[in-house]
Amino acid sequence: MSVLLIAKTLGLFFITAIAEIIGCYLPYLWLKKDGSAWLLIPAAISLAVFAWLLTLHPAESGRVYAAYGGVYVVTALLWLKAVEGASLSTYDAVGAAFTLTGMAIIAVGWNH
């Protein structure tokens, strides 16, 4: 994979993860934090965008989902810190590094 393709793939995975997290976080706010049921409308839209974004990758869907998982984990941890204000631990960092390593191994194999 070229450096440009890797950057595009990681960027698309990151945007995809944000769409998925928003699509799941809004119902969480409704169910657990007394948010408005109206939050379900943007949540549904966000999840539809998430599904569409996953179709934009040039590999079989199973490989895309597996590789995407690594970026999702890192994005979810960043969300945890930025949006929910939680502190990240060394375990979070080590786990994120392992998942990104797995993602990289899978993504490199797309062309083989």
From Swiss-Prot:
Native organism: Idiomarina loihiensis (strain ATCC BAA-735 / DSM 15497 / L2-TR)
Compartments where found: Cell inner membrane
Protein family according to the UniProt entry: Belongs to the UPF0060 family.
Pfam families xrefs: UPF0060 (PF02694)
GO cellular component, one term: plasma membrane
Record keywords, A-Z: Cell inner membrane, Cell membrane, Membrane, Transmembrane, Transmembrane helix
Protein name as it appears in the record: UPF0060 membrane protein IL2332
Main location as per UniProt: membrane
Membrane-spanning segments: 10-30, 36-56, 64-84, 90-110
Record membrane topology: Multi-pass membrane protein
